[in-house]
Amino acid sequence: MLTDEYVKRVYAQVEKRDGDQPEFLQAVREVFESLEPVVEKHPEYEKAGVLERLVEPERVVKFRVAWTDDEGKVQVNRGYRIQFNSAIGPYKGGLRFHPSVNEGVIKFLGFEQILKNSLTSLPMGGGKGGSDFDPKGKS
């Protein structure tokens, strides 16, 4: 449960803006719950807009993935690339190909990638890409 006013306010903004992305909202809430004690001890984070910058991607790219099936028919799927934070280095994050992929899923994975990458000693930012293309059974 979020108790800090700054954390609650930023989470409410995320809910309003990204309410159609439940995977992303869940990840943000869990991270905010973990960060809340630190944010309470450091009011300067609010002035610097740390949480606002953390949850807003630098770039969101949505594109089509066109391919030809075994019968020669052109199929079109959606692809996404979310680039969250390059403050400590270039974006690093893998690709996911699965029918369940949507913008919210890739946004959630990219958000978590920032935190994962920050735990390494390498200068890498966070990002993720993917498509709702299902590679299973394709030649």
Where are the model-predicted features located?
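N-terminal ligand-binding/catalytic initiation module
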Residues: 1-139
